Amino acid sequence: MSGRGKGGKGLGKGGAKRHRKILRDNIQGITKPAIRRLARRGGVKRISAMIYEETRGVLKTFLEGVIRDAVTYTEHAKRKTVTSLDVVYALKRQGRTLYGFGG
């Protein structure tokens, strides 16, 4: 199995390992106006100031679960790229079926 990278599939020597930037506190990227727009779409007229942090926390918890399941599907298929179908299946597993993305 010489001449193949870490994965064992494909040809080539496999490039140098890149350093991954440590991501922290990216949940603050979900801005106050973005949360406000989502609430407006849901029919909310007025929003309490404490809602924003609470919404970020709930969203982070929800996405962690979906991403964990999607990555599990990806690893089981021995792939390194998470596909839209992985996310669809992860959502379906959690009882939130999503239509329009195949599967």
Curated annotation (Swiss-Prot):
Residues 1-14 have a biased composition (Gly residues). GO terms for biological process: nucleosome assembly. Belongs to the histone H4 family. The nucleosome is a histone octamer containing two molecules each of H2A, H2B, H3 and H4 assembled in one H3-H4 heterotetramer and two H2A-H2B heterodimers. The octamer wraps approximately 147 bp of DNA. The keyword Endoplasmic reticulum does not apply. Its main location: nucleus. Core component of nucleosome. Nucleosomes wrap and compact DNA into chromatin, limiting DNA accessibility to the cellular machineries which require DNA as a template. Histones thereby play a central role in transcription regulation, DNA repair, DNA replication and chromosomal stability. DNA accessibility is regulated via a complex set of post-translational modifications of histones, also called histone code, and nucleosome remodeling. The keyword DNA-binding applies. The modification N6-methyllysine is found at residues 6, 9, 13. Residues 1-20 are annotated as: Disordered. It is found in: Nucleus; Chromosome. The modification N6-glutaryllysine is found at residue 92. GO terms for cellular component: nucleosome; nucleus. It comes from Emericella nidulans (strain FGSC A4 / ATCC 38163 / CBS 112.46 / NRRL 194 / M139) (Aspergillus nidulans). This is Histone H4.1. SMART domains: H4, TAF. One of its GO terms (molecular function) is DNA binding. The modification N6-acetyl-N6-methyllysine is found at residues 6, 13.
